[in-house]
């Protein structure tokens, strides 16, 4: 069993392996059994693969099905201490013997290796790409380039000479799980993606989330050079309420600075950021990662702006004693349009400075979760 750990602060966190590694291991194991490269399935309890990271990964085989001309192996996705939505999913690879003529025919419409001895497809629970701008061509299964290479490399290393196989990767629960991922936003329908660039899942990593944000900006910028950035699902719902189209909206989580950089690199012309005052106030004073562990400034922004506007210190202290920006806004009530105008203008200036004025930027700031209420906007009537 694969055991690898990283240090995170005072904690020791266990790494896992990607869906790409699972698919590779299952395909390799099925190929070994199909061509009798191991005596019996009872002897194949575990499979070892090489990862692009240069680290060998051993994975337990959860289930084996042997048919007349095929073998199917299942490996359970293990995410380590990064308890993502794919943890425990069955990743299956069905490897079937086919004739040379069949392989050559299938290679014209499926993924294949150079010698056309291996053809690869996605089955149930593996998404299909329906839009341009992704790493995978429109119409193909959502098996990303690195996992494709991994699967083909491992099978090529053991496939007997003059033998041909069709490999189908499936995820029985993938259809439902896929709906809870970024896939529908990216135009990937019907399941999850088989992912991974290193083969290893590193717990608590921001890399995967940033990669999704970058990919969504890249894909949506192909259709529109005017995008809407927001922080999460509540912000997205408010964007739709305001009339913005889903194909223009990108959820950037806490990584607003990173998202702005991606917009510039993808030649986006303009963005509108729509966000709750708690997140937006951080941007006003130069915080471009809005996570509370990185930037705890919120109430201080309101307090400082109230002070600069000449409000009484007793009111400033009441604001500082609130637990949240939401509470502070409710405490203040109506009549503080000048406060939100000042914060809003500083948000715009801060963001324009961050991107060296390479984007046209507008902002919409609101409060309230279940029933958002507009506080200030640079672009709405």
UniProtKB/Swiss-Prot annotation:
Q: Spell out the protein name for this chain.
A: Cobalt-precorrin-5B C(1)-methyltransferase
Q: Which reaction does it catalyse?
A: Co-precorrin-5B + S-adenosyl-L-methionine = Co-precorrin-6A + S-adenosyl-L-homocysteine
SUPFAM superfamilies given in the database record:
CbiD-like
Family, similarity comment? Belongs to the CbiD family.
One GO molecular function term of this record is: cobalt-precorrin-5B C1-methyltransferase activity
**Does the keyword field hold Methyltransferase?**
yes
Which InterPro entries does the record associate with it? CbiD, CbiD_sf
The gene behind this protein is cbiD
| NCBIfam families for this protein | cbiD
């Amino acid at each position: 069993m694969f055991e690898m750990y990283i240090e995170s602060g005072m904690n020791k966190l266990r790494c896992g392996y990607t869906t790409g590694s699972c698919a590779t291991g299952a395909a390799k194991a099925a190929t070994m059994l199909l061509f009798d490269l191991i005596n019996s399935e009872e002897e194949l309890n575990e499979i070892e693969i090489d990862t692009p990271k240069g680290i060998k990964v051993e994975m337990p085989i959860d289930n084996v099905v042997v048919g007349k001309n095929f073998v199917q192996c299942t490996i359970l996705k293990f995410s380590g201490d990064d308890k993502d939505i794919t943890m425990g999913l069955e990743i299956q690879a069905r490897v079937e013997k086919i004739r040379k003529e069949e392989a050559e025919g299938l290679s014209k419409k499926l993924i294949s290796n150079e010698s056309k001895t291996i053809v690869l497809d996605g089955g149930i629970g593996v998404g299909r790409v329906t839009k341009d701008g992704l790493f995978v061509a429109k119409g193909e299964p959502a098996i990303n380039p690195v996992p494709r290479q991994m699967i083909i490399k491992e099978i090529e290393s053991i496939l007997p000479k003059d033998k041909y196989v069709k490999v189908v990767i499936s995820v029985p629960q993938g259809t439902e799980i896929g709906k809870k991922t970024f896939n529908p936003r990216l135009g990937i329908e019907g399941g999850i993606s088989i992912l991974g660039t290193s083969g290893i899942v590193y717990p608590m990593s921001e890399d995967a989330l940033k990669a999704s944000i970058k990919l969504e900006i890249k894909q949506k910028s192909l259709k529109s050079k005017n995008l809407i950035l927001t922080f999460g699902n509540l912000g997205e719902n408010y964007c739709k309420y305001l009339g913005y189209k889903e194909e223009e909206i990108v959820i950037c989580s806490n990584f607003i600075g990173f998202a702005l950089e991606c917009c510039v690199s993808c030649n986006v012309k303009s963005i509108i950021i729509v966000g709750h005052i708690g997140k937006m106030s951080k941007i006003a004073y130069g915080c471009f990662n809005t996570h509370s562990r990185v930037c705890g400034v919120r109430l201080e922004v309101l307090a400082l702006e109230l002070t600069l506007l000449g409000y009484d210190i007793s009111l400033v202290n009441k604001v500082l004693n609130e637990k949240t920006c939401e509470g502070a806004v409710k405490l203040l009530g109506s009549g503080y349009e000048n406060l939100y105008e000042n914060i809003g203008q500083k948000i715009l200036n801060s963001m324009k400075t961050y991107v060296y004025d390479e984007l046209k930027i507008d902002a919409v700031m609101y409060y309230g979760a279940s029933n958002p209420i507009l506080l200030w906007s640079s672009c709405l009537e």
